[in-house]
Amino acid sequence: MAEITKADVVSFIENMTVLELSELVKELEEKFGVSAAAPVAVAAAAAPAAAAEAAEEKTEFDIILKSAGANKIGVIKVVRALTGLGLKEAKDLVDGAPKSVKTGVSKEEAEDAKKQLVESGAEVEIK
């Protein structure tokens, strides 16, 4: 069996579409339990103050679709409207529940999205 080199992997990735790359990143994040978001550098003196502020109130929320419920088609429509995904991608997201629908959104946006998803029959969690 031939050994795959780094050059082979880079060549393969170069030929992927943006959508395929996005899906690959999401899969890698889930597989290894990491985030592709750039880490934020904080000055050592400001770290305790920033940690205290973060403990007071969370500003970014993740919308997690736990299950689609009985009205799967309605949930897919709402997921498409919220995320801008295509039909196949939205269906795959709904079929693969529990999955993150949106990440790093404001509390208002998270609550609004949860309301829309619950009204369509989905079971949703905000983290």
Curated annotation (Swiss-Prot):
<comment type="function">
    <text>Forms part of the ribosomal stalk which helps the ribosome interact with GTP-bound translation factors. Is thus essential for accurate translation.</text>
</comment>
<dbReference type="Pfam" id="PF16320">
    <property type="entry name" value="Ribosomal_L12_N"/>
</dbReference>
<comment type="similarity">
    <text>Belongs to the bacterial ribosomal protein bL12 family.</text>
</comment>
<dbReference type="Pfam" id="PF00542">
    <property type="entry name" value="Ribosomal_L12"/>
</dbReference>
<dbReference type="GO" id="GO:0022625">
    <property type="term" value="C:cytosolic large ribosomal subunit"/>
</dbReference>
<dbReference type="InterPro" id="IPR000206">
    <property type="entry name" value="Ribosomal_bL12"/>
</dbReference>
<dbReference type="InterPro" id="IPR008932">
    <property type="entry name" value="Ribosomal_bL12_oligo"/>
</dbReference>
<dbReference type="InterPro" id="IPR014719">
    <property type="entry name" value="Ribosomal_bL12_C/ClpS-like"/>
</dbReference>
<comment type="subunit">
    <text>Homodimer. Part of the ribosomal stalk of the 50S ribosomal subunit. Forms a multimeric L10(L12)X complex, where L10 forms an elongated spine to which 2 to 4 L12 dimers bind in a sequential fashion. Binds GTP-bound translation factors.</text>
</comment>
<keyword id="KW-0687">Ribonucleoprotein</keyword>
<dbReference type="GO" id="GO:0003729">
    <property type="term" value="F:mRNA binding"/>
</dbReference>
<protein>
    <recommendedName>
        <fullName>Large ribosomal subunit protein bL12</fullName>
    </recommendedName>
</protein>
<dbReference type="GO" id="GO:0003735">
    <property type="term" value="F:structural constituent of ribosome"/>
</dbReference>
<dbReference type="GO" id="GO:0006412">
    <property type="term" value="P:translation"/>
</dbReference>
<feature type="region of interest" description="Disordered">
    <location>
        <begin position="101"/>
        <end position="127"/>
    </location>
</feature>
<dbReference type="InterPro" id="IPR013823">
    <property type="entry name" value="Ribosomal_bL12_C"/>
</dbReference>
<dbReference type="InterPro" id="IPR036235">
    <property type="entry name" value="Ribosomal_bL12_oligo_N_sf"/>
</dbReference>
<keyword id="KW-0689">Ribosomal protein</keyword>
<feature type="compositionally biased region" description="Basic and acidic residues">
    <location>
        <begin position="105"/>
        <end position="117"/>
    </location>
</feature>
